[in-house]
């Protein structure tokens, strides 16, 4: 059986403008803006939470099944994911829309002008999980990551109705969801992933307390930035893990996705919550050291050396055979 990852699939188009936006935008003409910036650099990165998580699971030697919606322009991206161990056979290809993309221009003052085109992502709501699970002969876990909100709700209901164990990872979509929708996404999840801000937002919108959340999920996993992560199970002591020291801090984008992949790999391998969280933190550290969410390389030997330095040889011995395949 496999881990199924549902979530967004997108590309990031990042441009750099050497001037200052404020020198080109006239305050007295804000009601009729028409400006163009000659940019100096363009970087295109593969992204989307679902694709990032699946990519990192593939790097750890698992064979995740990615479920999401893309456009006909996905072919090259799909080949990249396949080459890194991701099963993309369940990805829906839109006949009318392009793959979602984020376009952002940053000026010399670090001001940004950005746009997000959801595109084919809106068709994620048309994907049915049952035929995919039937073809696979079952699923160990379905991760429901940030995506088209209607698609997230559909997939959660389907998991609940058909008895598929699922992990809730609403992430940035919490901001646009109502409390009752959030409750529906979370109730009965085997795992709930949030960061500290998202956890506060979830509790405010649902009216739940920490205890209420723990009563509704099997395991609560909360990332805390540089402070690491806490893992809670109802009635058990909290597990806290700090991240390894990074060699450089290049770009935090995609760090949370990498953590989720590492943690879920640990779940799939049957290791403890602490060990799973350590795997997630180690993988997240690799991502923060590179620009782009899928630009890092996971060399098993180096990965395990750093893991052992951070968490000790006994901890490393428990996961080494899995990481090295």
Predicted feature residues:
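Gly/Ala-rich phosphate-binding loop of Rossmann-like dinucleotide-binding domains
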Residues: 58, 160, 268
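A glycine-rich beta-to-alpha transition motif near the start of alpha/beta enzyme domains, typified by
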Residues: 63-90
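Glycine-rich phosphate/adenosyl-contacting loop at the front of the ribokinase-like
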Residues: 1-65, 76, 248, 314-325
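Conserved phosphate-binding/catalytic region of the ribokinase-like
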Residues: 207-325
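Cofactor-binding loop segments of dinucleotide-utilizing enzymes, especially the Rossmann-like FAD-
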Residues: 7-8, 68-72, 93, 106-108, ...
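Conserved phosphate/ATP/ADP-binding segment of small-molecule kinases
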Residues: 160-165, 171-240, 248
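Conserved phosphate-binding/catalytic loop of the ribokinase/pfkB sugar-kinase fold
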Residues: 89-94, 102-141, 145-146
């Amino acid at each position: 059986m496999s881990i199924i990852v549902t979530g967004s699939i997108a590309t990031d188009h990042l441009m750099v403008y050497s001037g200052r936006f404020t020198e080109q935008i006239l305050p007295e003409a804000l009601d009729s803006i028409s400006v163009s910036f000659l940019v100096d650099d363009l970087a295109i990165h593969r992204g989307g939470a679902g694709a990032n998580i699946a990519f990192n699971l593939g790097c750890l030697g698992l064979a995740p099944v990615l479920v999401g919606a893309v456009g006909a322009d996905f072919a090259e991206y799909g080949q990249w994911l396949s080459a890194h161990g991701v099963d993309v056979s369940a990805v829906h290809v839109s006949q009318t829309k392009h793959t979602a993309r984020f376009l952002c221009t940053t000026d010399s003052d670090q001001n940004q002008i950005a746009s997000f085109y959801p595109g084919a992502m809106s068709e994620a709501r048309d994907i049915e999980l049952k035929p995919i699970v039937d073809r696979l002969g079952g699923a160990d876990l379905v991760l429901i990551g940030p995506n088209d909100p209607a698609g997230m709700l559909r997939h959660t209901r389907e998991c609940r109705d058909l008895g598929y164990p699922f992990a809730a990872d609403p992430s940035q979509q919490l901001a646009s969801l109502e409390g009752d929708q959030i409750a529906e996404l979370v109730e009965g999840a085997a795992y709930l992933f949030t960061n500290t801000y998202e956890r506060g937002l979830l509790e405010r919108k649902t009216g739940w307390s920490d205890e209420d959340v723990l009563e509704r999920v099997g395991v609560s996993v909360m990332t805390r930035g540089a402070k690491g992560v806490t893992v809670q199970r109802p009635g058990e002591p909290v597990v806290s893990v700090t991240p390894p020291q990074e060699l450089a801090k290049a770009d935090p984008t995609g760090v949370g996705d990498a953590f989720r992949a590492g943690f879920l790999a640990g779940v799939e391998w049957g290791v403890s919550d602490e060990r799973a969280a350590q795997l997630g933190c180690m993988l997240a550290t690799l991502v923060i050291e590179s620009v782009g969410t899928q630009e890092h390389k996971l060399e098993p030997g180096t990965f395990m050396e750093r893991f052992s330095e951070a968490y000790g040889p006994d901890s490393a011995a428990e996961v080494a055979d899995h990481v090295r395949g």
